[in-house]
Amino acid sequence: MNLDQYLPVLLFILVGIGVGVVPLVLGYVLGPNRPDAAKNSPYECGFEAFEDARMKFDVRYYLVAILFILFDLEIAFLFPWAVALHEVGMTGFVAVIVFLAILVVGFAYEWKKGALDWE
């Protein structure tokens, strides 16, 4: 097996890692590091924090965020199908209809369970 064909891929990976790591290392090495109490305190619109800045969030925020990401990701799977609509034929069409039916069943289940209600 000829490994010379993989040299551009290796170079691409190394450059990508370097673009991410080199600025971090340079900032850590060359940047000033003078922590004090004012820099480490929470900042709220120019005022001292009235209460603890770390507050608990309601679980519903996380639930809505997870549901959004889930359905957004599932809808993103439809774009390649739409691009290749003519090539996939009837089999691809039936597969997408089954996929959309599963999405609708999941959405109806979440709606019935009250995951989308704010009370």
UniProtKB/Swiss-Prot annotation:
EC primary class: translocase
Tell whether Cell membrane is among the UniProt keywords: yes
Reactions it catalyzes? a quinone + NADH + 5 H(+)(in) = a quinol + NAD(+) + 4 H(+)(out)
One example GO MF annotation: NADH:ubiquinone reductase (non-electrogenic) activity
Entry keywords, A to Z: Cell inner membrane, Cell membrane, Membrane, NAD, Quinone, Translocase, Transmembrane, Transmembrane helix, Transport, Ubiquinone
Q: Does the keyword Cytoplasm apply?
A: no
Q: Which domain of life is it from?
A: Bacteria
Membrane protein topology class: Multi-pass membrane protein
EC number of the protein: 7.1.1.-
Pfam families reported for this sequence: Oxidored_q4
Localization per Swiss-Prot or TrEMBL: Cell inner membrane
Cellular component aspect of the GO annotation:
NADH dehydrogenase complex; plasma membrane
> So where does this one cross the membrane?
9-29, 63-83, 88-108
Q: How does it assemble?
A: NDH-1 is composed of 14 different subunits. Subunits NuoA, H, J, K, L, M, N constitute the membrane sector of the complex.
Which purpose does this protein serve, as stated in its record? Answer: NDH-1 shuttles electrons from NADH, via FMN and iron-sulfur (Fe-S) centers, to quinones in the respiratory chain. The immediate electron acceptor for the enzyme in this species is believed to be ubiquinone. Couples the redox reaction to proton translocation (for every two electrons transferred, four hydrogen ions are translocated across the cytoplasmic membrane), and thus conserves the redox energy in a proton gradient.
Q: What's the family?
A: Belongs to the complex I subunit 3 family.
HAMAP family reported in the protein's UniProt record: NDH1_NuoA (MF_01394)
User: Which protein are we looking at?
Assistant: NADH-quinone oxidoreductase subunit A
